[in-house]
Curated annotation (Swiss-Prot):
D-glyceraldehyde 3-phosphate binds at S149, C150, T151, T180, T209, G210, R232. There is a cross-link at K160, K307 (Glycyl lysine isopeptide (Lys-Gly) (interchain with G-Cter in URM1)). This is Glyceraldehyde-3-phosphate dehydrogenase 3. Glyceraldehyde-3-phosphate dehydrogenase (GAPDH) involved in glycolysis and gluconeogenesis. Catalyzes the reaction of glyceraldehyde-3-phosphate to 1,3 bis-phosphoglycerate. The contribution of the TDH1, TDH2, and TDH3 to the total glyceraldehyde-3-phosphate dehydrogenase activity is 10-15, 25-30, and 50-60%, respectively. It is found in: Cytoplasm; Mitochondrion.
Length: 332
């Protein structure tokens, strides 16, 4: 049984808790969010506009939220170093604030007494692991790790399968990405990203993403071979990766489908999905895969040049992998 604490009770923090509570080998012992009172934390956990109402019982008292009779201690500390992770016997702190995502800042959880930290955001200093891609490289001496981003979790398994079978010479990725909490409901100030300050619900907004370059960190053989961008679109959840690649080996689209399907039914089962149905984004709400290859959406121009399409629930699929990584780290 791994004892976890969650820091940051936003979109990812709340879904991570839902998923963790369903795992027999994971015990959620505490959560911290300096901006949320216990009654509000219980309310937000119970009601979710995207993923629906929590099926069990949720209540609270002065020091806990109570889920299905289980008491989870709550704290409102701004500085993670002040949290009682040592006295709470926290094995792994899950940091889903998006703030403490580098080795020096995530170290605060270790200083507070947690044995290890899993960051639910890409990191430029902490080692990144993508389940199904490079988690076997994790060693128990690593105290702080990152689960990378939702888009990297979608792209990396597909890129690995394609690169292993055909070789990727180079590629460009576009993610058509649902809106997130960083965006604005109406035009507002956004000094570092002017486009990002425009109304989220009424625009298609070009944006940057480091997801494709990050694939090179989890798959060194693809370092420098992929880059990408994003379009933020007015859907609440589920995104889609468009990966256009030049291959080293000539192949057919049917052969690509066979290879991806075999991986989805084999070594990447549960991480990579496969469909030939005429699907749209809402069909993947609540899908726990990192990446679902859409076989009927891709196209091929020539034997070495293809466009591949893969869906992901950028909230639920990613949060599922966070808990998978927590369990993997705990076992190592």
């Amino acid at each position: 049984m791994v004892r976890v604490a969650i820091n940051g009770f936003g979109r990812i923090g709340r879904l991570v808790m839902r998923i963790a509570l369903s795992r027999p080998n994971v015990e959620v012992v505490a959560l911290n969010d300096p901006f949320i009172t216990n009654d509000y934390a219980a309310y937000m956990f119970k009601y979710d506009s995207t993923h629906g109402r929590y099926a069990g019982e949720v209540s609270h008292d002065d020091k806990h939220i109570i889920v299905d009779g289980k008491k989870i201690a709550t704290y409102q500390e701004r500085d993670p170093a002040n949290l009682p992770w040592g006295s709470s016997n926290v094995d792994i702190a899950i940091d889903s604030t998006g703030v403490f995502k580098e080795l020096d800042t995530a170290q605060k959880h270790i200083d507070a007494g947690a044995k290890k930290v899993v960051i639910t955001a890409p990191s430029s200093t902490a080692p990144m692991f993508v389940m199904g891609v490079n988690e076997e490289k994790y060693t128990s001496d690593l105290k702080i790790v990152s689960n990378a981003s939702c888009t990297t979790n979608c792209l990396a398994p597909l890129a690995k399968v394609i690169n292993d079978a055909f070789g990727i010479e180079e590629g460009l990725m576009t993610t058509v990405h649902s809106l997130t909490a960083t965006q604005k409901t109406v035009d507002g100030p956004s000094h570092k990203d002017w486009r990002g300050g425009r109304t989220a619900s009424g625009n298609i907004i070009p944006s940057s993403t480091g997801a494709a370059k990050a694939v090179g960190k989890v798959l060194p053989e693809l370092q420098g071979k992929l880059t990408g961008m994003a379009f933020r679109v007015p859907t609440v959840d589920v995104s889609v990766v468009d990966l256009t690649v030049k291959l080293n080996k000539e192949t057919t689209y049917d052969e690509i489908k066979k290879v991806v399907k075999a991986a989805a039914e084999g070594k990447l089962k549960g991480v990579l999905g496969y469909t030939e149905d005429a699907v749209v984004s809402s069909d993947f709400l609540g899908d726990s895969h990192s990446s679902i290859f859409d076989a009927s959406a891709g196209i091929q121009l020539s034997p070495k040049f293809v466009k591949l399409v893969s869906w992901y629930d950028n909230e639920y699929g990613y949060s599922t992998r966070v808990v998978d990584l927590v369990e993997h780290v705990a076992k190592a």
